[in-house]
C-alpha cells in the first residue's frame, strides 16, 4: 500500500482507532495531520509516527470550538493547498440510559460532536478535497446507527444522523468531483469507549485498533463506489 505524497487529516487521533489510523496512514507514506483535544497524547502519536519513519503535524483543537475547524482548513490550504484524505473519527459516548431520561446537555454535546462538527469539517475541507486527484472522506460509525438498541438512544441517533449527512454529501459530489465517501463500521474494538460501554468485557476478546486502521488504509489504496459502506470483522 503506497500513499506517498498524500495529505491526510484524522480527527480524534489522540488514542484508539484515531491514533492507530494516523500511524497506519503515515506508515503507508502519507503526511498525517493529527487533531484532538489532548495535546500531550497527540505528541505521543506524532513521536510514534516519527520513530517509525513517517511524518506528521499535530493540531490540538476542540471540534466544538467556534471557527476552530475553519481555521484549521485555512492552515492546511496555506501549507499544502489540498487535502487527500479526511478521516472523521472523533466521537463521544453519552451515558447509556432510557430515552425518556436522556440528559439534554449530554445529547446536545453528542449532536455537536457527531453531526455539527461533521458538517463543519465537510464544509471547510470540501474545497481542498476537490483539489486532490482522488479526495477521500472516511467516516467511522457504529452498528447501533443502523441497528438501534435499548439505552443507546443518544449515541445511536446522533451517529445515524452523521451517517445520513455523509451519505447525502457523497451523492452531492458524486458527479461533479472525484471525491468519494466511505462509512466504516469498526465493529467491536479495544478502545476506551468500548470499555466504558462494556466494563465487564475482557479487552483481549476484541480486536485491536490497528486492525481497523489497516482496513481503512487498504480501502484508501484502491477505488470504491461512493457512498461505500464497510464493516471490519
Model-derived segments and spans:
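Conserved mid-core segment of classical short-chain dehydrogenase/reductases
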Residues: 70, 93-108, 151
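Conserved glycine-rich Rossmann-like NAD(P)H-binding loop of the short-chain dehydrogenase/reductase
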Residues: 28-45
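Catalytic loop of short-chain dehydrogenase/reductase
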Residues: 92, 104, 130-131, 135-175, ...
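Conserved glycine-rich cofactor-binding loop
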Residues: 7, 14-16, 38
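Catalytic Tyr-X3-Lys loop
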Residues: 100-119, 138, 162
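Amphipathic alpha-helical dimer-interface segment in Rossmann-like NAD(P)H-dependent oxidoreductases
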Residues: 74-77, 113-133, 170-171
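C-terminal helical subdomain
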Residues: 179, 183-184, 191, 199-233
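Rossmann-fold scaffold of SDR-type NAD(P)-dependent oxidoreductases
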Residues: 11, 83-91, 114, 139, ...
Amino acid at each position: 500500500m503506497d500513499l506517498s505524497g498524500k495529505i491526510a487529516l484524522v480527527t480524534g487521533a489522540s488514542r484508539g482507532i484515531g491514533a492507530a489510523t494516523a500511524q497506519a496512514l503515515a506508515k503507508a507514506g502519507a503526511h498525517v495531520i493529527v487533531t484532538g483535544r489532548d495535546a500531550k497524547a497527540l505528541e505521543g502519536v506524532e513521536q510514534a509516527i516519527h520513530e517509525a519513519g513517517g511524518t506528521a503535524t499535530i493540531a490540538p483543537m476542540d471540534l466544538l470550538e467556534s471557527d476552530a475547524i475553519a481555521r484549521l482548513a485555512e492552515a492546511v490550504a496555506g501549507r499544502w493547498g489540498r487535502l487527500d484524505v479526511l478521516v472523521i473519527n472523533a466521537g463521544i459516548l453519552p451515558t447509556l440510559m432510557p430515552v425518556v431520561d436522556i440528559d439534554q446537555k449530554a445529547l446536545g454535546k453528542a449532536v455537536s460532536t457527531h453531526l455539527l462538527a461533521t458538517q463543519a469539517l465537510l464544509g471547510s475541507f470540501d474545497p481542498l478535497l476537490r483539489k486532490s486527484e482522488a479526495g477521500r472522506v472516511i467516516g467511522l460509525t457504529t452498528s447501533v446507527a443502523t441497528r438501534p438498541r435499548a439505552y443507546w438512544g443518544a449515541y445511536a441517533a446522533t451517529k445515524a444522523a452523521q451517517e445520513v449527512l455523509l451519505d447525502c454529501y457523497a451523492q452531492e459530489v458524486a458527479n461533479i468531483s472525484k471525491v468519494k465517501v466511505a462509512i466504516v463500521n469498526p465493529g467491536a474494538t479495544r478502545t476506551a469507549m468500548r470499555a466504558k460501554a462494556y466494563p465487564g468485557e475482557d479487552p483481549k476478546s476484541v480486536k485491536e485498533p490497528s486492525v481497523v486502521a489497516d482496513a481503512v488504509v487498504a480501502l484508501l489504496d484502491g477505488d470504491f463506489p461512493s457512498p461505500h459502506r464497510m464493516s471490519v470483522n
